[in-house]
């Protein structure tokens, strides 16, 4: 039985008896959790523990894996996203994702950010599209660095700038949730600090769920933390409490470095 504390406020995302199989291998076992609106929730645990699998359930990226099978319920604002009637394109507009390695499109910086709003019809004309692009880059802390380089390719930027461009691209379609799967693992310490500062600035405007192998990063950026082990949610609670007084022996062992 997972140890999960309660929190004040409403849930943006709720999982109930969520199970995931890849072929014959079960990756998640009866996961039950709630993710509060407008906060940063970190998911930690050893490699292969299921945290990224859970993250991919939130925007149904597992639909793209032929052998994946998902059962149970996963709610976004009370609506089960596993329902066959769910519009997955609209879901992924509401739930943006930033991947482990920066993956800018082979297009200009401008087009990287403009692509999503144009696809979803979010801009009435060129002027409004410009406003969305500039606002998104500004929110991602990148506008000042690229405002004179908008015609250059996204791949011409540094690794840290590319990752912030990907965050701007996610922001541009006005998501409610931003998923981040190890967003700093390929970045140097300076670029990592910039992304972490950005996450803190985005908190409140978005519900953010971040998977990280770095417990130090989880402690710095999140308000709540969930610990996964062998496909099971072991413990979830306020980040400060999790790191100072974990309640489950497995959580304590992982945090103190006895395994992982």
Swiss-Prot record:
Enzymatic reactions: phosphate(out) + ATP + H2O = ADP + 2 phosphate(in) + H(+)
Keywords: ATP-binding, Cell inner membrane, Cell membrane, Membrane, Nucleotide-binding, Phosphate transport, Translocase, Transport
GO BP, sorted A to Z: phosphate ion transmembrane transport
Pfam family, one: ABC_tran
Chief site of localization: membrane
Enzyme Commission numbers on file: 7.3.2.1
Membrane association type: Peripheral membrane protein
All copies of domain ABC transporter, residue ranges: 13-255
UniProt keyword annotation of Transcription regulation present: no
GO MF annotation list: ATP binding; ATP hydrolysis activity; ATPase-coupled phosphate ion transmembrane transporter activity
PROSITE patterns xref list: ABC_TRANSPORTER_1 (PS00211), ABC_TRANSPORTER_2 (PS50893), PSTB (PS51238)
Record protein name field: Phosphate import ATP-binding protein PstB 1
Organism: Paramagnetospirillum magneticum (strain ATCC 700264 / AMB-1)
Gene designation: pstB1
